[in-house]
Amino acid sequence: LYGANTTYHTGDDVYVIGHGGRAHALKAEVFARREFAGYWEYLLDEALFTAPLHPAWSGAALVDARGRLVGIGSLFVQQVVDGEATRGNMFVPVDVLEPVLDDLLTHGRRQGPPRPWLGVYLHDEEGRVVVQDVAPNGPAATAGLAPGDQIAAISDQPVVQVGHAWRVLWRQGAAGVEIPVTVVRD
C-alpha cells in the first residue's frame, strides 16, 4: 500500500492522481528529493519534487509504478532545474505521515506537546535569515520584530538558513517556553 521514500530517486517515474481520478492522472518524474523549509514555520527533511506540474495538486496522491502511495500533494513550485525554470509539485512523503497517522485519524492532529511558535514568517537572503512578516498578536509581534529584521541567533545559536532556524526553535522545548532571539536591525 505504501512505498518508502528512501527508494525513490531523481529521475524515477511516478503518477500524480488528483481531482478527477484516473482520467486526470499525470505521469511525472521525481526531479529532486531535498529539504523544504516554508516561511510559515514548516519544515520537511526530504520532500519529493515532481515535474511536470499537475494543476489539481492539492491533496493529490503520488503513486509509483507498482500502485503504492508515496506522497501527498502539498504545493505548486517553480524551480530552476538544469538551468531552466521548471513548474512542478512538492509532495509530503508518506514516510512522515506513518508515525502520526493514528493520531491524525483519532484526534485530527498530532498528539504530544505543541512546538514553540514565534509567529514570524522568514526567508533566506544572501546567507541571512530575514523576517518577511509577523503574525498579528503573536510572540514576534509582541517582542517588536518587524519585516526586514535579521534573525542572527535563536537561544544563542547562530542561524543562517530558515530550515536551521526552525530546527533550533523546535529544540527549545514545548510551546510557551521563553526563547531568546538575537535580532539585527538596519
Map each language-model feature to its residues.
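Active-site region of chymotrypsin-like
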Residues: L1-Y2, L26-R87, P116-L118, R128-Q132
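Conserved active-site neighborhood of the chymotrypsin/trypsin-like protease fold
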Residues: L1-A25, A47, A56, G127, ...
